[in-house]
């Protein structure tokens, strides 16, 4: 796994690659350290970063209602309180 700034840049590149209407999980962004992906996103202040397209491994939301509203506006399907990953999961590339 890359370290430091390289890892951070790769995680952010992966987030930006998720198209509207789809989601990826923290584990997709950084399989060896999903929490690191969350920390990188939390410390990023780029208003254009589509942070709302990243969800937990079970499809639940980390941020809550604001995240849900943004995803619903993009047409992301839900099953109850979770994103329907069978329909909305995006396979990110650019290995971290």
Task: Name these PLM-found stretches.
Residues 1-96:
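Nucleic acid-binding interface residues in structured DNA/RNA-binding domains
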């Amino acid at each position: 796994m890359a370290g430091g700034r390289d890892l951070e840049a790769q995680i952010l590149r992966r987030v930006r690659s998720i198209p509207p209407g789809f989601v990826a999980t923290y584990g997709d962004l950084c399989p060896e350290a999903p929490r690191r992906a969350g920390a990188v996103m939390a410390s990023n202040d780029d208003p254009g970063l589509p942070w709302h397209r990243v969800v937990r491994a079970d499809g639940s939301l980390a941020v809550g209602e604001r995240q849900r509203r943004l995803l619903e506006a993009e047409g992301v399907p839900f099953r109850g309180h979770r994103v329907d990953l069978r329909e909305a999961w995006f396979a990110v590339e650019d290995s971290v």
